[in-house]
Amino acid sequence: MSDLAKGVIPEYKIYIMLSPVDLDKEEREATEKYMKRDDSTIIWQYAPGISDGSSLSAKNIEDVTGFRVSLQKDAREFTGIFADKKHELLDGLRGDYYGITTGNSAISPAVVITDKEAETLGYYKDTGDVSCAVKKMDGWTSVYTTIPCLPAQFFRNLLKENGKHIYSEDRNVVVLANDRYVAVNSAYGADTEIHLDSNY
């Protein structure tokens, strides 16, 4: 976050914020200036900005993510279920569980999305409250999951929606690539098809 506050990060189409729970005034201003622009998409997880350095509140999260939320003091399982509906971000995921699906994952406070202007993508498994949603903002798109550990397929769908190159449609294949090499790891050792981009 210090690089963001200094304005020294490159411009990206997609930003993934892995639950920066404590965002001070300078860091909040930097997200507005350097990230929320040029049709970018930002993925937020759990409770981004719940603390501004002096207080903990739902309003702090709303100011950062653009979503209306509520804080629930009762512990909730960090397990969600994706909505069973047609949406480009849910391709191959409709009705699937996500998050921490084994063991005890209860956490408090739980964050619930209450924004009526957002499009719901997922729910808490144990309560049915909204846990994942997307919202078009002024010049950018906000994607928020209050349950972390989104599956790779979700990110693949997001990249597709933003017109980015996808090397493999196989959910069991990991591809690492740059302009010099392509490395492929298949969980099951089966034949797979790799789509090379214009760099090769």
Q: Where are the language model's segments positioned?
A:
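A conserved amphipathic helix/loop scaffold
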Residues: 10, 18-200
